[in-house]
């Protein structure tokens, strides 16, 4: 996993609340066995509407997704995070997230930022008015800056540490590889081994 320090660029003003994982990536896309290539399935059903915000040329290349409350609700579907990330989003800003989706984002290097509903509304309006506006999510300083918005956000210290250092679950485990090997060498031969 790559470290996440700052996500800066254009933002996609989605703004919908209660977007579930089935809306983020349809179930028929889950048959794939690779983690890449899911970006083309992001909001697939909604993208059939030519007026859907993701289809607008002015929002192409956005790296920050701005959503409504309870983003990522529904079934636990890590593919939803893969679709968000594979499309090019490094951060998602919303008033709230479904817990499982938020945890899956952390484990895959996507920064989730919870801001007050009114702040998200102002940011959405500003980006809709000026699609070229830059939004900056700085994990090191725990700040979000955009047109008319400059604020701090809270994030769990351990989550922040993981993201800043690019540590997924495997990366965290490998940080203790020597300790694990030392423990395995010290175990009597008649004890079970981890392979």
Swiss-Prot record:
Its EC number is 4.2.1.33. Keywords: Amino-acid biosynthesis, Branched-chain amino acid biosynthesis, Leucine biosynthesis, Lyase. InterPro entries: 3-IsopropMal_deHydase_ssu, Aconitase/3IPM_dehydase_swvl, AconitaseA/IPMdHydase_ssu_swvl, IPMI_Swivel, LeuD. NCBIfam families: leuD, PRK01641.1. GO terms for biological process: L-leucine biosynthetic process. It holds the Pfam family Aconitase_C. It catalyses: (2R,3S)-3-isopropylmalate = (2S)-2-isopropylmalate. This is 3-isopropylmalate dehydratase small subunit. The gene is leuD. Belongs to the LeuD family. LeuD type 1 subfamily. One of its GO terms (molecular function) is 3-isopropylmalate dehydratase activity. GO terms for cellular component: 3-isopropylmalate dehydratase complex. It comes from the Bacteria. PANTHER family: 3-ISOPROPYLMALATE DEHYDRATASE SMALL SUBUNIT, 3-ISOPROPYLMALATE DEHYDRATASE SMALL SUBUNIT 2-RELATED-RELATED. Pathway: Amino-acid biosynthesis; L-leucine biosynthesis; L-leucine from 3-methyl-2-oxobutanoate: step 2/4.
